Curated annotation (Swiss-Prot):
Name of the featured protein: Enoyl-[acyl-carrier-protein] reductase [NADH]
Protein family (similarity comment): Belongs to the TER reductase family.
Residues engaged in binding NAD(+): 48-53, 74-75, 111-112, 139-140, 244, 273-275
Naturally occurring in which organism (per UniProt): Pseudomonas paraeruginosa (strain DSM 24068 / PA7)
GO molecular function: enoyl-[acyl-carrier-protein] reductase (NADH) activity; NAD binding; trans-2-enoyl-CoA reductase (NADH) activity
Binding-site positions, substrate: 225
Amino acid sequence: MIIKPRVRGFICVTTHPAGCEANVKQQIDYVEAKGPVVNGPKKVLVIGSSTGYGLAARITAAFGSGADTLGVFFERPGSESKPGTAGWYNSAAFEKFAHEKGLYARSINGDAFSDEVKRLTIETIKRDLGKVDLVVYSLAAPRRTHPKTGEVFSSTLKPIGKSVSFRGLDTDKEVIKDVVLEAASDQEVADTVAVMGGEDWQMWIDALLEADVLADGAKTTAFTYLGEKITHDIYWNGSIGAAKKDLDQKVLGIRDRLAPLGGDARVSVLKAVVTQASSAIPMMPLYLSLLFKVMKEQGTHEGCIEQVDGLYRESLYGAEPRLDEEGRLRADYKELQPEVQSRVEELWDKVTNENLYELTDFAGYKSEFLNLFGFEVAGVDYEQDVDPDVQIANLIQA
């Protein structure tokens, strides 16, 4: 079938398999051009491996370090009449290219919050890999069913303590609008922490330790975003921030648990990028459009693969990791440079419907957004017939 983009709000409801494959190939080419990651990982588990930063972490491990990788995700395949999710096509493409290189690559499709998926993962590691030396935790989910109680929690994106008004960008209508977000209730904050905080990461590491499938010196990292003051009210100081602060607490216990193995656990701070998760945050499209404009002018613009490749080389496996006073690994330093943030702030209030394309890089934002779903990827002929029914060989279905 011929597949065209159909965007509804902050999601594109169609995806393009050939575009997703080309997108994955571009990321692989970027990593390979950088050469090997010195002393990089060899057997890697990526929890949340199908899109965005998790996919970039899997690509960097495999193609920067020659690592065998096991990926966990929750995606939907295509059929003859309907495309699957982008993460499905990304993972199929990743495995295809990894197998061509002679690398082990397998995937588990199911709910990573569940005990069943943890059990299947451990069985697969024992059978195929023995032990893993890196565990990347990169889940972004709107809800979580607690594996012990069955309780269902939903995450909320709201400020804490007070309602907040700010400028936003309606990406459908392409207009600047004022948005008001009401303050989260205590319950909403607690539920958001239950979904996006560190409990599940801790459960994963506990399960892997108990099963004795973590190698000596094993590392684990979970990804976070801090941002600067423009986004603080609704992000770092809001309900999502409460969950991210929970990661900062939980990592201390995880680090202690890994100490007997000579291992380490770190939260890694990455820059703001276009992902399916970030496009749902009301102020992010405007912030990202301005950030892209400023960072491209300065020659420092980066996407997921540049960020994660740099994180591996500089910090996770670098001789002098970039650590902050909280012990987090930092890859977001270019975004937070004072000259970048002050310029974004200066332009923030000047943007109007009339000068949107002039003052911001909304065009670049839109293009990167469509790239997520396999559209507007260089070198892909979108008039060609494609088969949306793409298989992932040896997929383990939970």
